[in-house]
Regions:
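Conserved metal-binding segment of the jelly-roll/cupin
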Residues: 208
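Catalytic-core "active-site belt" of small-molecule-metabolizing enzymes
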Residues: 1-197, 205
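Conserved RNP beta-strands of RNA recognition motif
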Residues: 200
Length: 208
């Protein structure tokens, strides 16, 4: 209840008990319970905790999924308010999925995942906690807090093309202080399409 209120009012709360974070299964249950109480349109599903090195370090087998709500979506050019609990920004790829996917009975694989994609585009995810002085110790820390999502800033969608995103270097520069941060798509669960494959199979399995 406290997390849901924090989500709805854009406020922060004292940390939830660590027992809900240590066990990823409990964290997933908490996330789903909280998501079910949000009276807002679900516009997408994201993969969270996709950093391969982080997963190995945390001894977790796979990432998690989380709902993306309409009120969390921001169009390119709009302002986003942040606070000390905002932890960063991530460059992402988003995909629009064809309706035919929901009638498909088989498993989504690396070889067939592209046939379900209609559009694609760039986006930024603003990540952070709704809890005071929260530290990232377990995967459940970010999973249980609405998947660590604060806002999604989406760019223009284009018709899907089979682009090679396996080794795409990115660079973010702060206009305020000139700090530059480099990244690469190859650290995110192999590549964006593999993350999508994971999400689509979870959607089918859990009937999201």
């Amino acid at each position: 209840g406290r997390l849901v209120k924090a989500f709805n009012t854009n406020t922060v709360i004292n940390p939830i008990p660590v027992k809900y974070c240590k066990n990823i299964n409990l964290a997933n249950k908490l996330r789903k319970l909280c998501e079910d109480q949000i009276k807002d349109e679900t516009i997408g599903i994201k993969a969270g905790g996709t950093g391969i090195q982080a997963l190995k370090k945390l001894k977790e087998k796979e990432p998690f999924t989380a709902k993306v709500f309409k009120k969390r979506l921001v169009k390119s050019g709009q302002k986003v308010k942040i606070n000390q609990h905002t932890k960063g920004i991530e460059v992402e790829v988003y995909y629009f999925i064809k309706k035919s996917f929901f009638d498909y009975k088989g498993k989504v694989t690396k070889s067939n995942v592209t046939k379900f994609i209609k559009f694609m585009g760039p986006c930024f995810e603003i990540v952070g906690f709704r809890q005071r002085n929260k530290k990232f110790t377990y995967l459940g820390d970010i999973c249980g807090d609405f998947g660590f999502n604060i806002k999604f800033v989406v760019g223009r969608k284009t018709k899907f093309k089979k682009l090679n995103l396996n080794n795409l270097k990115t660079s973010l520069v702060s206009k305020k202080n000139g700090v530059k941060v480099n990244g690469n798509t190859n650290i995110v669960y192999i590549n964006p399409l593999n993350s999508l494959r994971f999400v689509l199979n979870k959607v089918k399995k859990e009937k999201i």
